Amino acid sequence: MRRSSRPGSASSSRKHTPNFFSENSSMSITSEDSKGLRSAEPGPGEPEGRRARGPSCGEPALSAGVPGGTTWAGSSQQKPAPRSHNWQTACGAATVRGGASEPTGSPVVSEEPLDLLPTLDLRQEMPPPRVFKSFLSLLFQGLSVLLSLAGDVLVSMYREVCSIRFLFTAVSLLSLFLSAFWLGLLYLVSPLENEPKEMLTLSEYHERVRSQGQQLQQLQAELDKLHKEVSTVRAANSERVAKLVFQRLNEDFVRKPDYALSSVGASIDLQKTSHDYADRNTAYFWNRFSFWNYARPPTVILEPHVFPGNCWAFEGDQGQVVIQLPGRVQLSDITLQHPPPSVEHTGGANSAPRDFAVFGLQVYDETEVSLGKFTFDVEKSEIQTFHLQNDPPAAFPKVKIQILSNWGHPRFTCLYRVRAHGVRTSEGAEGSAQGPH
């Protein structure tokens, strides 16, 4: 601000502008070149730290302030009014500190007023320098680096802990396996300790193997010998065994002589025997009722060979057959044989005889003597023997078997084998062996 000149002073009425600058800035406020003011910038050869002068050698720029004092521009503090000076003397003699002397007659600011400039206050109100910001950024960067390093250390420590756990688990499993293996060895070694301590040499081992091989060869030779002996015995006894088998088959466990065999002289009286069953369709007859492709004669009942279909069939469920015995026989039993239902091709035994009667016949007068009535049960054994009612015993040259019914077949009845048991008498005793009339 402009200040009025003091009375009696020859100061110019020019406008004064104070030159304030910061230590961080090399530029200062300059005066107006149009008014002939001197620039506040340091001249050539002038030190940089030289303080700026006012526009004239008069007073520094002041502003109206509180009464009784003056206020420096740019400062909020109130300063007392300076003491009066001889401006000419001061301007002629005073020089700026650290600079060249001014020409005579130009006002120069003394050091004492310069000390009164509010330089310190201006510096305190300046914004913080950029160095502080750089320091903060460096501090934050350092903290971030430290945090990243700490995180890496923690991750590495976690990995180490995991690897240590894995190693501990592996070592535990390995120790358990070794313990089990050791216990197994102890269990196996303990029986071996009870064996003889002496170990066999290789030659002794070969000798034992050789001796055992010889023993095996001897056993094989004995087995071959026994096999040959058994074969010889079988060959020698084959005929005997066959005879025994056929004998048992012929006897059929009856163990009684059979006088109704064609091989001992028995025959069929065809005149007194029923007619054979004649079927027009022999193929149907064979396939359905398991017969041969032709009708069997009644002599088949005198043969020892009994198998399904090898029988004598007569028409209907009633018929008779008369057997001529090889001599006079005191009859005691009659045996009938019929295959069981399980082996019949027709799946049943309904053609078997059921109720029948036995008669003894004399040769001369053809007198019939009843020897009893009986029933053949197909559910029982296939061979059934019936005891005759011949008391007192009488000898007969013929015997008649009369079939009264069968087991349900509507067209025919089959008779397989008939046996006559008793005692054969001599010709001299023929007259005394007469049965009742």
From Swiss-Prot:
Disulfide bonds: none
UniProt entry tagged with the keyword tRNA processing: no
Domain annotation SUN: ranges: 265-425
Record bears the keyword RNA-binding: no
PROSITE patterns, per the entry: SUN
Biased amino acid composition, Low complexity: 1-12
Pfam families: Sad1_UNC
Biased composition (Polar residues): 19-31, 72-88
A biological-process GO annotation: spermatogenesis
PANTHER family cross-referenced by the UniProt entry: SAD1/UNC-84-LIKE PROTEIN-RELATED, SPERM-ASSOCIATED ANTIGEN 4 PROTEIN
UniProt-recorded name of the protein: Sperm-associated antigen 4 protein
